[in-house]
């Protein structure tokens, strides 16, 4: 099967996919006809394409945006890029605020489509709301810990929920459990999981928490349990579900210690296998469906 045939099969199967980080290519998630396993492909405007890993894609996307902190490219602190391949286009908006929070908003859409006069930016490219998917990547250092998140916005919403302001106040209890499990993990080197902890019966959200299981390597860290608790609590307190049904926050100390916090609505397909929900920097993952409100 030729490159263009594969490309068309990818677009036909999934319609639209995820992000772009350069002017001559886009990234599409799809699979070859007759195969059930999705892969991530980098597709160039000349029709050539090759498979990439999730980490390669994320490094490409964030690597361009990291240049925004360089004084020589200060204009990249606020910039936008549009790339198109055949009938699929991707629009990437970069922003770095004064507190160092990096936000990358991505929309992926098919053309030609109906014009959306409700948005000047969308109207310029003839983007139809129903044919567009939105995703956001964020990263920030909180309490000395690297915190990152990636989200999809869905066409339907679960009940509005503020994780920091809930009457059930789950954040403090969750982070206390994270702290105690982290202490144990650093001494026993076993990794740990907290599975399906119901945090609010009114809206049916549950939480699953895990450290990466790297044996003794996951114990060799300078990250204190208090720092991890502080970062987790501040990140969770900034979260609002909006139109999100499942998301993940990733924490690491820049070394070997890694912690993933998955919050999942009972309406989400992910409830059947929460550990299959990918997280930012998740090793070996070629998918994305995790979340952050940019920790504001």
Swiss-Prot record:
Lineage top rank: taxon: Eukaryota
A single MF term (Gene Ontology): toxin activity
One annotated Gene Ontology cellular component of this protein: extracellular region
Sugar-bearing residue positions: 46, 71, 122, 146
Signal peptide (UniProt feature, chain positions): 1-20
Keyword Glycoprotein in record: yes
Spans traversing the lipid bilayer: none
Keywords: Glycoprotein, Signal, Toxin
Functional summary from the UniProt entry: Kills sensitive strains of yeast.
Family membership noted in the UniProt record: To yeast YER076C.
Designated name of the protein: Killer toxin KHR
């Amino acid at each position: 099967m030729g490159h263009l045939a594969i490309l068309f099969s990818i677009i036909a199967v999934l319609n639209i996919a995820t992000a772009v980080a350069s002017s001559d290519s886009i990234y599409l998630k799809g699979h070859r006809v007759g195969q059930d396993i999705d892969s991530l492909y980098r597709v160039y405007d000349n029709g050539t394409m090759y498979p990439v890993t999730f980490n390669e894609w994320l490094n490409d996307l964030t690597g361009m945006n990291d240049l925004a902190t360089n004084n020589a490219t200060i204009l990249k602190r606020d910039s936008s890029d549009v790339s198109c391949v055949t009938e699929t286009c991707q629009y990437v908006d970069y922003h770095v605020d004064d507190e160092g929070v990096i936000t990358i908003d991505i929309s992926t859409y098919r053309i030609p489509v109906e014009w959306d006069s409700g948005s000047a930016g969308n109207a310029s490219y003839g983007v139809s709301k129903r044919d567009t998917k939105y995703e956001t990547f964020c990263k920030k250092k909180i309490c000395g810990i690297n915190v990152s998140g990636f989200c999809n916005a869905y066409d339907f919403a679960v009940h509005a929920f503020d994780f920091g302001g809930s009457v059930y106040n789950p954040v403090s209890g969750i982070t206390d459990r994270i702290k105690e499990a982290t202490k144990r993990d650093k001494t026993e080197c076993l990794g740990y999981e907290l599975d399906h902890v119901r945090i609010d019966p009114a809206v049916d959200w549950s939480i699953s928490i895990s450290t990466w299981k790297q044996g003794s390597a996951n114990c060799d860290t300078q990250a204190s349990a208090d720092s991890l608790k502080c970062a987790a609590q501040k990140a969770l307190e900034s979260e609002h579900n909006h139109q999100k049904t499942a998301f993940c926050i990733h924490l690491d100390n820049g070394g070997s210690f890694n912690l993933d916090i998955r919050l999942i609505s009972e309406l989400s397909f992910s409830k059947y296998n929460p550990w299959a929900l990918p997280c930012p920097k998740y090793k070996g993952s070629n998918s994305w469906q995790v979340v952050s409100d940019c920790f504001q």
